[in-house]
Swiss-Prot record:
It catalyses: uridine(55) in tRNA = pseudouridine(55) in tRNA. One of its GO terms (molecular function) is tRNA pseudouridine(55) synthase activity. This is tRNA pseudouridine synthase B. The active site is at D38 (nucleophile). The keyword Isomerase applies.
Length: 300
């Protein structure tokens, strides 16, 4: 089967566990996910089956929205609730106004240092493997983009914020840095991913939904179409001649179109056909094709 599932990941399992469960339910090997969530985090994780796995790379340009609970006055070695406490300090002096003003410092492009408990590699080793050995190394700072951050509630010592951010943002690091700026320390108490591009919690499925669909023989019916993952890309409708060229792996020329990194191609029947990318000579080549070439009729 080819398609996408918008899964609401429960607490306590890894993103790989989600993929494994989907593989078992669908009896299908070609399954992947579109964005790792830590075991303690819950919420949206798109899961791709069959041909749709070829679209995972295009999710890197979409934003994610998180609901985060941050507790002030405590730091942990993992920056979240799973780690060992390394620092405590009273936060009685912190006001809602102080938090609001400090959060504004995190708008736009910011510099983050990945947590030691992360999948980032250092000399070929995952940081979390080094951290479990009690080894701390210097990490290379990274640029992250925060499109919006909203303070929803503050009842000392816990605040709730909604964050819209770009690819590669560490909410744990944001919580840690917020605590440092406020002078009292902080850690990420809980995290829910509410949205990831076109996918959101409102129309997500849990594993009970998948099991029910399996019992009813409706597993194919709950799959989202491939184009759900690339709704953020520019799109163009092409005639049969150009579609045929793309299906055959040939470049095409387009007039009056901007040149983003990728464009989704549809045919006259509004069916998703391919993703094309620009060449330096002004032509476009097929990066991914999702329909097969129709067999040629006999010459008789």
């Amino acid at each position: 089967m080819d398609g996408i599932l918008n899964i609401n990941k429960p607490f306590g399992i890894t993103s790989f566990d989600v993929v494994a469960k989907v593989r078992r339910i669908y009896s299908q090997k070609r399954v992947g996910h579109g964005g790792t969530l830590d075991p303690y985090a819950t919420g949206v994780i798109p899961v791709f089956l069959g041909k749709s796995t070829r679209l995972i790379e295009y999710l890197s340009s979409v934003s994610k929205t998180y609901l985060a609970e941050i507790e002030l006055g405590v730091e942990t070695d993992s920056y979240d609730s799973e780690g060992e406490i390394t620092f405590r300090k009273t936060c009685d002096y912190v006001t809602r106004e102080m938090i609001y003003k400090t959060l504004m410092d995190f708008q736009g492009e910011i510099i983050q240092i990945p947590p030691m408990y992360s999948a980032v590699k250092h000399r070929g080793m995952r940081l979390y493997n080094l951290a479990r050995q009690g080894i701390e190394v210097e990490r290379i700072p990274r640029v992250a983009t925060i499109y919006g951050i909203e303070l929803l509630n503050y009842t000392s010592p816990v605040l709730r914020v909604r964050i819209e951010c770009g690819h590669g943002t560490y909410i744990r690091s944001l919580a840690f840095d917020l605590g440092r700026k406020l002078g009292c320390g902080a850690y990420l108490k809980s995290l829910v991913r509410e949205a990831y591009g076109q996918f959101n919690l409102t129309n997500s499925l849990d594993f009970a939904d998948l099991e029910a669909a399996k019992c009813d023989g409706k597993l194919a019916g709950i799959l989202l179409p491939l184009e759900t993952a690339i709704g953020h890309l520019p799109r163009v409708s092409l005639d049969e001649e150009n579609i045929t060229r793309l299906v055959n792996g040939l470049e095409i020329t387009l007039d009056r179109i901007d040149k983003p990194e990728a464009v989704a191609v549809y045919n006259a029947e509004n069916s998703f056909v391919a993703i094309i990318q620009p060449e330096t000579d002004g032509t476009w080549h097929p990066a991914k094709v999702f329909i097969r070439q129709s067999p040629k009729p006999d010459a008789n």
